[in-house]
Amino acid sequence: MSGNTIGKLFTITTAGESHGEALIGIVDGCPPGLALTEVDLQDDLDLRKPGTSRHTSQRHEEDLVKILSGTFEGKTTGTPIALIIQNTDQRSKDYGNIKDTFRPGHADYTYHQKYGIRDYRGGGRSSARETAMRVACGGIAKKYLKQEYNIKIKGYLSQLGPIKIENSDWLEVHNNPFFCLDANKVKILEKYMDTLRKSGDSVGARINIIVNNMPVGLGEPIFDRLDADIAHSMMSINAVKGVEIGDGFRVVNQKGTEHRDAITLTGFKSNHAGGIFGGISSGQDILVSIALKPTSSLSLPIESIDKRGGPIEVITKGRHDPCVGIRATPIAEAMLAITIMDHVMRHRAQNLNIESITPIIPASI
C-alpha cells in the first residue's frame, strides 16, 4: 500500500488502523534545534480526540502522543522524529456484522476490490482515526512556523448543515465543542445535533482555515503550486469533498473588475485570490475552506451487497460522529501546517539568497 507519505523536503508518513494496536508517525526534514516535547503536540490532539461531548463519537481515546526518536535533551536533532499514539478503546465486536458486507458510502467496497482483503474493524486504515497522528505531526510544523516566521494557522466551523456561522469572535473558538466563533449560535447547534442524533441521521459541515503572517514566495510552479498542494492535503482528509481557495466557487459569478486584487504600496485592497497568485503566496492571508460530507455510518437501514454479490440490508453499529466536521478543525489546521512547512523548506533550499528591488507589499490596507 503506497500513498502514506506527504511532502517533499518536510515529510510525514503515518501507519496504523482504527482498531490496531497503535498509530505511528514519522516526521522527516524538521530542522535541528527546535525545542520539542510531547506537551507541544498534546493540546491539538486533545481538541481532536473523540468522546469529549455528546455531539461526537463516544469512543474514549486519550490520544497521548509519545516521541520515540529525533530529539535529544528536549530539542530536535534533524533526524527522523518517530511518534506513537496507542489505541485503547477499540470495540471490534461492534463490526462483526459487516465482516462480509459492504457499507454504502464507505471505503469497504473499494478497499476490498483494490487489495482483495480489508480490515473491517472500524474501517481499518480508511478510518478517520488515522488523523490523530496527522494532528500530532502537524503540531511540529505549527510550532516551527510560528517560532521562526510567526506564521499562525487557525480554523473554525463556518457551517453545520443549514446553520451558517457568520459572526467572528476568536475568543470563542475553543469555548465550545463545535469550534464556533459565535457564542449565540452554540445552543442552536446543540439543539440541531440533539434532534439529528435522535433521528439516526448525520449531516455535513464546512470548515474555514486562515493562515496569518505568510511570507511572499512560497509555492513551486507549475505542478507543485502552493494552492495545488493545499488542495491535495485537504482532499486527503477523510470525508472532504470540496476545497476552496479564496473566493472559491463564488468566482463564477464575479467579473474581472470585481475579482482582481488591487496592489498599492500600503497594501492589497482585497484578497479574493486567497493569498496566492500563480501558485505562489503573495504575503496576504491564505484563505482555505473545506466541505465535509455527512458520515455514512448510520443506524438506519440501506441496501447493499455482500462479498458474493448477494443483496442485503446494512445497519451500521458502533460509535460514530453524527457530524465529522465537528472534530475536523484541528485536522485541517495540521494538514495546512504540514503543507506550508514543506514549502518553507523548499523555498529556503532554492531561493534563500534571492533579493528584489521591489518592496514587500503589506498583506492588506
From Swiss-Prot:
PROSITE patterns in UniProt:
CHORISMATE_SYNTHASE_1 (PS00787), CHORISMATE_SYNTHASE_3 (PS00789)
| Positions with a binding annotation for FMN | R125, S126, S127, N238, A239, G278, K293, P294, T295, S296, S297, R319
Quote the catalytic activity from the record.
Answer: 5-O-(1-carboxyvinyl)-3-phosphoshikimate = chorismate + phosphate
Biological or metabolic pathway of the protein: Metabolic intermediate biosynthesis; chorismate biosynthesis; chorismate from D-erythrose 4-phosphate and phosphoenolpyruvate: step 7/7
Molecular-function GO term, any one: FMN binding
What Enzyme Commission number(s) appear in the record?
A: 4.2.3.5
Q: List the disulfide bonds.
A: none
Keyword NADP in annotation: yes
* GO annotation, biological process: amino acid biosynthetic process; aromatic amino acid family biosynthetic process; chorismate biosynthetic process
Q: Which residues form a coiled coil?
A: none
Keywords attached to this Swiss-Prot or TrEMBL record, sorted alphabetically, are: Amino-acid biosynthesis, Aromatic amino acid biosynthesis, FAD, Flavoprotein, FMN, Lyase, NADP
Tell me which GO cellular component terms the UniProt record holds. cytosol
Q: What cofactor is needed?
A: FMNH2
Highest taxon above the source species: Bacteria
Amino-acid positions noted as binding NADP(+) in the UniProt annotation, renumbered to this chain = R48, R54
Q: What does the entry comment about cofactor binding?
A: Reduced FMN (FMNH(2)).
Q: Which InterPro entries did the record assign?
A: Chorismate_synth, Chorismate_synth_AroC_sf, Chorismate_synthase_CS
Which Gene3D superfamilies does its entry note? Chorismate synthase AroC (3.60.150.10)
Task performed by this protein: This reaction introduces a second double bond into the aromatic ring system.
Family stated for the protein in its record: Belongs to the chorismate synthase family.
**Cross-referenced NCBIfam families:** aroC, PRK05382.1
Assembly and oligomerization? Homotetramer.
Q: What is this protein called?
A: Chorismate synthase
Record organism = Vesicomyosocius okutanii subsp. Calyptogena okutanii (strain HA)
